[in-house]
């Protein structure tokens, strides 16, 4: 039923071909949340980063309170490397973020 509709965006940014790492970002429209689109898109982007772009490491930043996103990232093998205090500003206050990453050698599809 959602065919041919834009449900969100996934992108690889800050691509560094020397150090072979990049940042991954994903946003799914709220009305499509919980339907598996985030996991599907995330898997495809990870495969592209590792197999086509030959990245060694993919990383991301996530709101420390976003348990749903953290669960998806952990299910894909991402591990928390650190907590960044008051990393971003939203809705009138600063929020903490986790820095998470996945190494190609640790990725299992």
Predicted regions and their residues:
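Conserved catalytic-core motifs of GNAT/GCN5-like acyltransferases
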Residues: 59-62, 79-96
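Conserved GNAT acetyl-CoA-binding A-motif
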Residues: 51-61
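Glycine-rich acetyl-CoA-binding "A-motif" of GNAT/NAT acetyltransferases
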Residues: 4-8, 68, 94
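Conserved active-site tyrosine of GNAT-family acetyltransferases
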Residues: 73, 78, 100
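Acetyl-CoA-dependent GNAT
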Residues: 1-31, 103-107
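Short glycine/proline-centered loop/turn elements that form peptide/ligand docking sites
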Residues: 38, 42, 65-69, 86-91
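Conserved acetyl-CoA-binding loop-helix of GNAT-fold acetyltransferases
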Residues: 28, 34-48, 70-75
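Terminal substrate-recognition subdomain of acyl/acetyltransferases
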Residues: 93-109
